Amino acid sequence: MRYIRIDKVEPGDILGKDIVDINGKVLLKASSDMTLSENIIAKIKERNIQGIYVDDEISKGINIEEAIPMTVRHMAIKALKKKDVQETEKIAEDIVNNFDGKVEIDLNRMMGDVSYFERAVNISELCLSLGKRLEFSDDSLSKLVASALLADIGLIMTEEEKKQILEKVPQDLREKILSLPNESASPILGKFVAAQNQADPMVIHSVYFHKENENGTGVIQNVYEQWGIQQKCDVRDTAKIIHICSDYIDALIRENDFTKARNMIEEGIVQGKYNYILASNFLRFIPMYPIGTLVQLSNGEIAAVVKNNDGFPLCPIVKLQTGEQLDLTKTLNVVIQDIYYSNKKGKQL
C-alpha cells in the first residue's frame, strides 16, 4: 500500500487501510473489493481528511504500520482535548512502553495530520525516535514524550482558561502575559498549566523553553528582553529536541514537501537555531522518501520505496514495476530523481 493525498485519489483506486477519524471511529473499512467511487471520494473530502492509503500493483506487499498503536494515539488525543496534564503524563509512559522502534516513521500520514492534537502526537513520536537513538532511559523518554504532547497547550486555551490559569499571578504580570502575541504567550501559559497540575519539573522546563534557539535567541529570550529581564535561558536537551521536531512537522504540513522540511532543519543548524549534535542525529533517521512513496529513478523507471537504509536518507530500497528490488546504497549508478503520484510527476505530494 501507499499513501496518497486526497486530491490525487481517483475513482477506481482501492482503499488499502481503514479510514479512521481523530476519535478512532472507523469511517470506511478497507478490503480488497473496496473500490473508491467519485461519491465516496467526495464524502472523504467532506470529512477534511487529507489523504488515504491505497493498494495498487506497484505497492503490493508494502505494509505501512504504526510505531504507536492507534488505540494509544487516540488515548493521547483524548487527554489533550481535555487538557488533562496528569493523564497525558501517564499516557506518555504508555507511548514509550508500546512504541515499536523497528517500524519506520510514516511521514506521509504526518504531513496530512493538520489538527493540533494529531500534530502533538506526531511531534512526540519524532521526539521519542530521536530520544531512543540517543539512548535516553525510559524515564527520560516518558518525560520527553509528555513534554512534546503538552508543548503547545497554551495555543488551544480559551480566553477564560487563560484568565483562570493566571488568576494567582500578580496583576501587572498577568496583563503583560495577556498582551503578548499568542506565539509568545503560549509557552508561558503552558508552563503555568503544567506547574499548576503538578507536572514533572522536566516537563515544565521543556514546555517553557521549547522555542529557544541554540544561538541564544528565541521566544522566551525575546520576552525577557522586552520586559527588561537580564537573564539568559538555560535550555536542556529535551526542550531542544522538541524544538527540532515541532519545527520539522510544521514545515512538513506547511510545505507538503519532505525535501523542503529537511532543508529547513539543515539551514537551521547553519543559522545556529538548532543544536548541531541533536539536529544531525535527527536528520540521520528521518527518511527523505517514506515507505510507499513513488519515485522516478535516473534510469527512467518508476519504483516504490520499500524500506529506508538507516543513515542513508537518499538511498532507500525500492521496488520496480517488475517486482525486482534495488538497494540504492549498493546500486551506485541509479539514483532517485523525483517523486511521482499515480504515475504523474509532481514535487508537491
What is the predicted role of each segment?
Residues 1-90, 214-235, 254-349:
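Terminal helices and disordered tails flanking the catalytic cores of nucleotide-processing hydrolases
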Residues 14-19, 100-107, 160-163, 239-243, ...:
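Short amphipathic alpha-helical segments, especially helix-boundary/capping motifs
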Residues 24, 128-132, 246-249:
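A broad detector of the eukaryotic-type serine/threonine protein kinase catalytic domain
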Residues 31, 113, 131, 251, ...:
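Short, flexible active-site loop motifs that bind/organize anionic cofactors or intermediates
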Residues 41, 128, 186:
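Short glycine-/small-residue-rich flexible loop motifs, especially phosphate/cofactor-binding loops
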Residues 55-179, 196:
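Acidic/His-rich, divalent-metal-binding segments that scaffold phosphate/diphosphate chemistry
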Residues 123, 146-157, 169-280, 288, ...:
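Alpha-helical scaffolding flanking metal-ion-dependent phosphate/phosphodiester catalytic sites
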